[in-house]
């Protein structure tokens, strides 16, 4: 560091003002803190984006190893008569650690220098000035030179150190590159001392605000900057204009006729990224929505729970319409326990593994009804369930079901169940609604809950099937009762999931470990296997579908329609339904219902 004229500092003492350079060890005073050991460094890119006062230096603090802008009147050299006094001002552990850290740096600077270099990167003080020119409409062709200069140099990097106050000299270090890399070539140092012009509106300030993208305007700016090196008088851009002066001086000092400068593209992009608003960062950092993994049925796997049950298969033939997530798992267990099964699915390829396992495949639902004694249906929504019964080649195309049983396992509303039951009875059939409550994993382990209503004789005939796929089975009486109970249970599940997702999203904003929250939750009386499982999925970001989010939102919609008919107010369920609808719009329709966490988090 070099000395300059005497100035009066904040303490009233008269001392020599120092012009600091990178790697100068100093004492720095921040508001609210005692003087702290630090080092002058080149500012990192994220610090460049912050507004700062004039006459500030970027300081690296030992101990905490972070960066901040400090005014020059709050900086003193580390070595001096004041060192002993300042070292005794504070004795907390953090201060002692900082003193130890700087002493280690004096002995061996390698570790700290490496950390500072990683944070700050290669010094390029022209980056911000060039960025401003691009922002103000300067043509990119005038920023990035495409041809080499007359003497083979690729550009000039000017490093300005010192105070921009009036009357102070400016030390300009000009690294003239005679090869391809300005970092490795020797530096030629030039001293340029001069007085600043008064802070009045200059020609440069006017030309910077001129027409965007015009080559003529760009030429005016360069000419004006050469005529008036003080640059614009705007206080907020004073610091940036100092870098602009240095670039102009460097161009004049170099032997290149064009003086074109290269802009570090990566540095510019990083500077732009540092200026993004927090909401923009959250939006851009949102995870990419990927398709959930395709669910492949492993026909060779066997559930230990199912193997322990003493199941005697019925001699009747069971038809199954729909081989979706739940349907395929149920059919697999029925085949494994020795039941005779006939299957149909809209996508015929899904039937192939079951055909290889011994099931008979039919072309239409009507063909399945002809070949089976009891027909199960498990599709995704009420409309699909109705289409299979009343549609073309549907169940009722036979006209006479000959006392066959039809079991509706799709999640439907009570009115739809009553309509299907009425149609089956009119065609001389028997009807049972058997709502299944549980996840795909519970279905694979035979741990579902069956809620049945309708014809009691059908319920008895399906005893072996229900024992295969469920741990508990309930007969609830008339048609519609089972649908109501199932939708009520789904309401509890949906509201609980949204509450869990919002709570974990809040913990994530506090930077609290989600796994810690779940571990503590497991010790409370609120715990439940379902919430624990969903919480772990949210913490891991594992949204492979056990119960698709679209199915959960469908159930909530059915609940609200059912409540509307009764004039029953359900405000919390309504909000929960909107949350799931929004999550569907984000692209998580086919993911697990725990993906609602993504919506709460972002």
From Swiss-Prot:
Disulfide bonds: none annotated. The PWWP domain is a H3 reader and strongly binds DNA. GO terms for biological process: sex-chromosome dosage compensation; transcription elongation-coupled chromatin remodeling. GO terms for molecular function: chromatin binding; DNA binding; NAD binding; NADP binding; nucleosome binding. Belongs to the HIBADH-related family. NP60 subfamily. The modification Phosphoserine is found at residues 8, 10, 224, 228, 243. Residues 176-188, 204-217, 224-233 have a biased composition (Polar residues). Pfam families: NAD_binding_11, NAD_binding_2, PWWP. The keyword Phosphoprotein applies. This is Cytokine-like nuclear factor N-PAC. Its main location: nucleus. Nucleosome-destabilizing factor that is recruited to genes during transcriptional activation and colocalizes with a subset of trimethylated 'Lys-36' histone H3 (H3K36me3)-enriched regions. Binds DNA (in vitro). Facilitates Pol II transcription through nucleosomes. Facilitates male-specific lethal (MSL) histone acetyltransferase complex targeting to active genes on the X chromosome. Stimulates the acetylation of 'Lys-56' of nucleosomal histone H3 (H3K56ac) by nej. May have oxidoreductase activity. Signal peptide: none annotated. Gene3D superfamilies: 2.30.30.140, N-(1-d-carboxylethyl)-l-norvaline Dehydrogenase, domain 2, NAD(P)-binding Rossmann-like Domain. NAD(+) binds at residues 319-333, 411, 554. SMART domains: PWWP. It is found in: Chromosome.
